[in-house]
Regions:
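Glycine-rich phosphate/diphosphate-binding loop of Rossmann-like nucleotide-binding domains
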Residues: 210-312
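Glycine/serine-rich phosphate-binding loop and adjoining beta1-alpha1 elements at the start
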Residues: 104, 124-238
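Glycine-rich, N-terminal phosphate-binding loop and its surrounding beta-alpha-beta segment
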Residues: 69-141
Length: 439
């Protein structure tokens, strides 16, 4: 069914898609966006391998609920514009929906549908009791003042409030949003319901019920999986070399934690350039250079290098932790690392994936490798519901347990079915959601 509600100064559409079906091949439909096309193709392949019937396939593919809202904004200069926002809840079979809110010009309904589906699989793979959701507003946040972003966030929260809540759908930060955004969302929701509700979002400041360890969780998850994969390959951390593409939140944290684990990080890049030191780079020096100049480029005691060559270095481990589609059909044949751990979302194209598999390069997919943030978001939600907060050591240890358990499950599926880790991760996740639905 569909419901349209006319609101003062706004528009809201809620669509319950539990009965939505995938169009037949001969039906005329609007072509899906590439992310949604990829998500549906991955699901179809998993369903075929698992031998599920078409009815279950339809259930797994269809978003459970979709919402599109109009957000009137009065700019600081007095002008008014109307923005578009979305929230898609893909699946509730394993628990309330969970997923980020992004502020980006790329946000549209098809992208949000795809990201919500991928969140369902990620939560299931990590054995976190959530379904998948995603949301966002179609803006470039750099073009708005802090006051304007607050107004956008608060109005967006009020509009999607009918379908979110600590037992229904729990938003979190994503591209273009941060802990301040989550603080505004939590405050707006709490004011609207009449009481403080810490568990309505995760990724909040620690002072408002956020979890210790949340800021570094994604990087920590990357490193936990990387160390487990190195062990699987028979490589001691103290003997391993690594190259990390990206020195943002994920990349910088990965460099710091790899160094602490004894791995020699010999190359690092950011959007402005790359540096190398075959004797090993040091996180503190890179971070100081970043603070002083805005880039790791020209860090004292290092040599400059072509950033494009970083992914092709003769190292044990490569961590793409910047942007998507950096490992391609063109450069994959030149990759010499034995292990690629995807810290970024979608850094490896399908063509590159096939080439790396043929070369015997082990690729740990993003759905597993960068899932640490989702796990600690779950921990934050649990702590908020209990009104009891864990120590940093407890958070770190429980994160490690979850990441290693997920790695072992994916590896076991990969070996038993003789498929790549990426295929194994999707199969494991889809199977868990299907079992929950059918139980």
């Amino acid at each position: 069914y569909e419901i349209s509600l006319g609101l003062v100064g706004s528009e809201m559409c809620i669509r319950d898609s539990s009965m939505t079906r995938i169009p037949a091949e001969d039906e005329a439909v609007t072509a899906p966006s590439p992310p949604l096309d990829n998500a549906l193709a991955q699901l179809s392949a998993a369903v075929k391998t698992l031998g599920y019937d078409e009815g279950l396939h339809q259930m797994l593919a269809a978003p459970r609920r979709e919402m599109a809202v109009s957000i009137p904004l009065r700019r600081d200069d007095g002008s008014t514009e109307v923005l578009r926002g979305y929230r898609v809840q893909h699946n509730f079979s394993r628990g309330p929906a969970k997923g980020g809110v992004r502020f980006s010009l790329d946000v549209d309904l098809d992208e949000v549908r795809a990201l919500a589906m991928w969140m369902t699989w990620k939560c299931a793979l990590l054995d976190v009791p959530y379904g998948g959701a995603k949301g966002g507003v179609t803006i470039d946040p750099r073009q708005y003042s802090k006051a304007e972003l607050e107004r956008i966030t608060r109005r967006y929260t009020s509009e999607i409030q009918p379908i979110i809540g600590p037992e229904v759908d729990i938003p979190a930060p994503d591209v273009g949003t941060d802990e301040q955004t989550m603080a505004w969302m939590m405050d707006t929701y709490s004011v609207n319901v009449g009481h403080t509700t810490l568990g309505v979002v995760t990724g909040k400041p620690v002072s408002l019920g956020g979890s210790l360890g949340r800021a570094s969780a994604t990087s920590a998850g990357v490193v936990h999986v990387a160390l487990a994969a190195l062990e699987h390959l028979g490589i001691e951390p103290s003997q391993a070399t690594a190259a990390v593409q990206g020195f943002g939140k994920v990349g910088a944290g990965t460099v710091e934690l790899l160094e602490a684990a004894g791995v020699k990080v010999v190359a690092v890049s950011d959007q402005y350039g790359a540096v190398r030191d075959d004797e090993g780079l040091h996180y503190d020096a890179l971070q100081k250079q970043l603070w002083d100049t805005g880039s790791v480029k020209d860090t004292p005691g290092t040599a400059s290098m072509d950033a494009d060559e970083l992914l092709e270095m003769d190292v044990d481990l490569v961590v793409p932790a910047a942007v998507q589609s950096v490992l391609t059909e063109e450069n994959a044949p030149r990759v010499r690392a034995r292990l690629v751990v995807e810290g970024a979302n979608g850094p490896t194209t399908g063509e590159a994936d096939r080439i790396l598999a043929e070369k015997g390069v082990l690729v740990v997919p993003d759905i597993l490798a960068n899932a640490g943030g989702v796990i600690v978001s779950y921990f934050e939600w649990v702590q908020a519901n209990q009104a009891y907060w864990w120590s940093r050591e407890e958070v770190d240890e429980r994160l490690k347990q979850r990441m290693v358990a997920a790695w072992k499950a994916v590896l076991a599926t990969s070996e038993s079915r003789r498929v790549s880790l990426r295929e194994a991760a999707t199969l494991t996740a889809v199977q868990r959601v299907a079992e929950a639905h059918r139980t």
